[in-house]
């Protein structure tokens, strides 16, 4: 057994101990109140979940990232899973790009669960275009003035620091392109608005944040021109986590639906004995298995790749939506009753996977940008019609 495999197994055992009945109770309470339990982040930090995942390096242990994501997915709460992964993705930003003690202290506090982090990227107009940033940063008094409004800032009502994507206007105030920075802003210096009412993921406290403050120079995480690269790194971490959460959630739902099929009888037979339903479930299981194997392959590679994270997130999200829809269908009328089964809530939750962390189309563009045509193969096998050359 390799050392890497041994340490990953140790981490999985740690997760098995940490995600106990107390975590399940916090999750159930959060679903009822639609508020994220800060004590969960504190618990994960105190028990070493983030410390063991990150170690001393700037790069995440990808196998442990995926192991944590699978465990979060099995909780059956997208709001809880995504909230934890967003906090951890902000840690990823700081671990790689923090260059001073001020930022390193924030990072280590977050790893210990003593501080909660969130990311402010989307502008008030919404959307995924981070190249056009309205929030402005100006150099003032050995620090920076930060002004703007961020629309979708999950965890902002309970967080201590926001990793804000902004635009430096020191040299080109009129331009809305380029000069993107990432800067840490304490939530004590901003105005978090009332959390939105959402279709699903109730516990994921998400609100607009109004920013008009000054922060010290050491709060700058990524200097002008490097902000997009930095936030892309954090997003890749989030996307890979979402894929793992979808895999964990999908497997749990399939297992519960299969139990339903074994127990429920219609027309003199169990649902499982009806071939059409059984084949439908087998198809879903096969594809969820393939997703899990793909995640294992990424874990074995040991590298957080931006394109691979985009590809597996969009593929997982679309599969997860299908899994939930089909399983809810197999539950029949009971699946549509929120007081009888959680299928309807899980179905609504899964939609977030196709929107949060980048929509399908944004992620497909990242995949498309890395595709390479095989001109040699084409020329060898295909006769070009006259006029093509």
From Swiss-Prot:
Cofactor: FAD
Keywords of this entry: FAD, Flavoprotein, Oxidoreductase
GO cellular component, one term: cytoplasm
Keyword Oxidoreductase in record: yes
GO biological process, one term: fatty acid beta-oxidation using acyl-CoA dehydrogenase
Any Pfam family matching the protein: Acyl-CoA_dh_1
Record pathway: Siderophore biosynthesis; mycobactin biosynthesis
Catalytic activity, EC: 1.3.99.-
Coiled-coil region(s): none
GO molecular function term, any single one: flavin adenine dinucleotide binding
CDD domains: ACAD (cd00567)
Organism superkingdom: Bacteria
Keyword Flavoprotein attached: yes
Protein role: Catalyzes the dehydrogenation at the alpha-beta position of ACP-bound acyl chains. This results in the introduction of a double bond in the lipidic chain, which is further transferred to the epsilon-amino group of lysine residue in the mycobactin core by MbtK.
PANTHER family: LONG-CHAIN SPECIFIC ACYL-COA DEHYDROGENASE, MITOCHONDRIAL, MEDIUM-CHAIN SPECIFIC ACYL-COA DEHYDROGENASE, MITOCHONDRIAL-RELATED
Protein family according to the UniProt entry: Belongs to the acyl-CoA dehydrogenase family.
Name of the protein described by the UniProt record: Acyl-[acyl-carrier-protein] dehydrogenase MbtN
Organism taxonomic ancestry: Bacteria, Bacillati, Actinomycetota, Actinomycetes, Mycobacteriales
Name of encoding gene: mbtN
């Amino acid at each position: 057994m390799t050392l890497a495999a041994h340490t990953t197994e140790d981490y999985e055992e740690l997760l098995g101990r940490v995600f106990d009945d107390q975590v399940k109770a916090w999750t159930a309470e959060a679903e009822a109140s639609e508020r994220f339990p800060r004590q969960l982040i504190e618990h994960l930090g105190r028990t070493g979940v983030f410390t063991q995942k990150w170690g001393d390096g700037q790069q995440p242990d990808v196998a442990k990232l995926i192991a944590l994501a699978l465990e979060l997915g099995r909780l059956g709460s997208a709001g809880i899973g995504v909230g934890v992964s967003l906090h951890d993705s902000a840690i990823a930003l700081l671990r790689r790009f923090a260059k001073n003690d001020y930022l390193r202290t924030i990072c280590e506090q977050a790893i210990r669960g003593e501080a909660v982090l969130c990311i402010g990227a989307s502008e008030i107009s919404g959307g995924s275009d981070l190249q056009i940033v309205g929030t402005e940063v100006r150099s003032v008094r050995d620090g920076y003035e930060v002004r703007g409004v961020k629309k979708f800032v999950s965890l902002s009502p309970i967080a201590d620091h926001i990793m804000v994507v902004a635009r430096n206007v020191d040299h080109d105030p009129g331009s809305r392109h380029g000069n993107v920075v990432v800067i840490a802003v304490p939530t004590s210096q901003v105005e978090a608005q009332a959390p939105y009412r959402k279709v699903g993921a109730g516990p994921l406290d998400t609100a607009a944040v109004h920013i008009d403050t000054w922060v010290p120079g050491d709060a700058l995480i990524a200097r002008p021109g490097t902000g997009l690269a930095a936030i892309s790194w954090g997003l890749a971490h989030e996307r890979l986590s979402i894929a793992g959460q979808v895999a964990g959630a999908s497997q749990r739902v399939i297992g519960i639906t299969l139990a339903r099929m074994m127990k429920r009888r219609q027309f003199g037979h169990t649902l499982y004995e009806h071939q059409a339903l059984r084949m439908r479930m087998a198809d879903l299981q096969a594809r969820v298995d393939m997703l899990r194997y793909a995640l294992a392959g990424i874990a074995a590679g040991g590298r957080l790749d931006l394109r691979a994270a985009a590809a597996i997130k969009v593929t997982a999200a679309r599969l997860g939506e299908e899994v939930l829809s089909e399983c809810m269908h197999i539950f029949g009328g009971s699946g549509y009753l929120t007081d009888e089964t959680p299928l309807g809530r899980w179905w609504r939750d899964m939609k977030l996977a196709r929107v949060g962390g980048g929509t399908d189309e944004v992620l497909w563009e990242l995949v498309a940008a890395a595709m390479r045509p095989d001109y040699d193969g084409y020329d060898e096998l295909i006769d070009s019609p006259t006029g093509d050359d």
